[in-house]
Design a protein with these regions (language model features):
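Accessory, non-ATPase domains that flank or precede helicase/AAA+ motor cores in DNA-metabolism machines
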Residues: 1-286, 290-292, 296-297
């Protein structure tokens, strides 16, 4: 299934190579009913009606529907039901007369309901932040794998560096993966990204129901969202043209999964960055011994 949905042919070949060398093992697991896309019934105007056909002072249901469709040539069935009392028979007659047609449109279930937060401007970077960002920018433009460790206490401005780096990658047409510990995946953090990048941001974590996760995953897979924010399992997101991976609080033990399949989200992210030729940025106030040792060497 992964081979069928993953768009990167290089990944296909790499996985086949690992399988042929017995470096990975293929298993079969029976799963329950799959989550399906959520569909809504919509109405499309095909042939406007002549208003002279109606001489009554009181608007008929057909007239009300035509007025709505003149404002929006396509509209959700439920919206018409909200604005016109019991419209089913009138809609059926309009369809028979060839004025309208019914069709289904996919809608995406979103974990964070409501509109996008108010747009926030990017803050000007301090000299120290700018020095870090310039290195990240050069790496992104070169398109070669590099890993960096950014050490700074909470509130020191690491997130603002992340935001600027994501904007740079976004300008270059590259997708971005931001991993954070589950406990840190707060609405405030997510809205800092959504207020700057809008619907390009997708969220993936365990607090979502199956439908919400499925739809966010689908938005990423189809390229509607190029910036993913999530906990450790988000590292497996089906991203195209991956250019930047940020692992915040890289020392956090929650990146390790104890259940099968066991993996370390940070290490998988670094390896994925290596395979994709992406820039990887580790951030922490107290870096892990492994990362500190890698920097020293």
């Amino acid at each position: 299934e992964w081979l069928q949905c993953n768009p990167d042919k290089r990944d296909h070949q790499q996985l086949r190579n690992w399988l042929s060398k017995d470096q990975v093992q293929s298993t079969q697991v029976l799963i329950g009913q799959k989550t399906k896309p959520k569909m809504e019934r919509w109405i499309r105007l095909l042939k406007p009606d002549n208003p002279n056909n109606y001489v009554s002072r009181r608007k008929t249901k057909k007239q009300q529907i035509f007025e709505i469709l003149n404002e929006n040539s396509e509209i959700c069935w439920s919206e018409v039901q909200n604005r016109v009392n019991a419209p089913s028979q009138a809609l059926k007659k309009l369809k028979e007369d060839g004025h309208i047609e019914f069709f289904e449109k996919r809608v995406y279930r979103r974990f964070m309901e409501g509109g996008l937060p108010e747009i926030e401007p990017f803050k000007e970077l301090t000299p120290e932040q700018k020095s870090v960002f310039e290195k990240l920018s050069d790496s992104l433009k070169n398109g070669t794998y590099r890993t960096y460790l950014l050490e700074g206490i909470t509130g020191s401005g690491k997130t603002e560096v992340y935001l600027h780096a994501v904007r740079e990658a976004h300008k270059l047409g590259k997708s971005c993966l931001i991993l954070v510990p589950e406990i840190s995946l707060t609405p405030q953090l997510v809205n800092r990204f959504r207020s700057r990048f809008g619907d390009h941001v997708a969220i993936l974590h365990s607090g979502m129901d199956d439908g919400e996760r499925f739809d966010e995953w689908s938005r990423v897979r189809h390229g509607f969202a190029s910036i993913v924010i999530g906990a450790r399992s988000a590292v497996f997101s089906p991203m195209k043209n991956l250019g930047l991976i940020v692992i915040d609080e890289e020392h956090d033990p929650s990146y390790k999964q104890g259940e099968t399949p066991r993996y370390h989200g940070r290490d998988v992210a670094i390896f994925r960055g290596y395979e994709a030729g992406a820039t990887v940025l580790l951030g922490s106030a107290t870096p892990s011994l492994e990362s500190s040792n890698n920097v020293s060497n």
